[in-house]
């Protein structure tokens, strides 16, 4: 089968070796999928360190993976960045996988942003990363768009932005529209209207409030706030629950 062939080709390189999985902070399922891939597709033994925002997953992982824990091929741990650093640099660990931002990747591999002063990476083990990006949402300029289609796609985009308080790796971040598209203004107006109507969750992710503030400061009058601003009480509650940028 296709799965069998994947197991043959993948496990020969990594099979039986230890991989550290640094869990995602924005979605529960990502860490689970990463562990399953490394265990059953790549043939690795896995140590997963959960993101500080999602340490609640630890107890569930202990139950779900109990048979593999008893076999000695899986472990679930919690801790801060220091714990993560000790794990990835441990001599028994052969590879690393993480879901996070480029700053986290560079901190692990280079000890910070790569520069001419530090041409050699601190971590030379194989590492795979799923990093966030500025995901574009591209509109094809076609005169045949109907009002119904404009509304449908504007709401699709608005819901993608609102989902998970926009704290997803692939959340659309940039809308690309042809400057001469005759429906451009109508689409943007419909999108703004949809965003005003969708209830927004509290942006819980560490540091997101500061990023929003910097964005607004950078663009000045060109930045438009749509919907209600986060109340001071809600912002303080999010900061208390999840702390500053981790």
Where are these regions (language model features)?
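Flexible, charged surface loops at secondary-structure boundaries
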Residues: 12-14, 88-91
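Conserved small-residue-rich beta-alpha loop and adjacent elements
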Residues: 1-68, 72, 135
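Conserved phosphate-coordination/catalytic loops
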Residues: 56, 78, 148-152
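Short glycine-rich anion-binding loops that position phosphate/pyrophosphate groups of nucleotides
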Residues: 25-26, 100-103, 133
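Short acidic loop-to-helix transition motifs that present clustered carboxylates
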Residues: 28, 78-83, 103
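Conserved residues at the C-terminal ends of beta-strands
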Residues: 22, 80, 99, 178
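Alpha-helical segments flanking ligand/cofactor-binding loops in enzyme cores
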Residues: 37, 85-86
């Amino acid at each position: 089968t296709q799965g069998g062939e994947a197991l043959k080709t993948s496990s020969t390189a990594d099979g039986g070796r230890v991989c550290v999985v640094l869990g995602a902070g924005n979605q529960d399922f990502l860490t689970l999928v990463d562990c399953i891939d490394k265990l059953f597709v790549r043939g690795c033994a896995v140590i997963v360190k959960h993101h500080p925002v999602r340490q609640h997953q630890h107890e569930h992982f202990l139950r779900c993976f109990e048979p593999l824990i008893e076999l000695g091929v899986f472990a679930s741990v919690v801790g801060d960045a220091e714990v993560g650093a000790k794990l990835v640099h441990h001599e028994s660990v052969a590879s690393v996988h993480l879901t996070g931002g480029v700053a986290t990747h560079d901190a692990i591999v280079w000890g910070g942003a790569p520069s001419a002063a530090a041409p050699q990476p601190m971590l030379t083990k194989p590492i795979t990363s799923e990093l966030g990006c500025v995901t574009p949402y591209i509109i094809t300029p076609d005169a045949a768009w109907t009002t119904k289609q404009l509304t449908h796609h504007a709401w699709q985009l608005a819901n993608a932005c609102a989902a998970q308080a926009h704290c997803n790796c692939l959340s659309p971040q940039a809308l690309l529209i042809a400057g001469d598209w005759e429906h451009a203004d109508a689409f943007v107006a419909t999108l703004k209207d949809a965003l005003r109507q969708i209830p927004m969750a509290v942006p819980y992710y560490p540091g997101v409030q500061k990023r929003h503030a910097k964005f607004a400061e950078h663009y000045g009058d060109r930045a438009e706030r749509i919907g209600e601003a986060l109340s001071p009480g809600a912002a303080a509650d999010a900061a208390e629950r999840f702390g500053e940028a981790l």
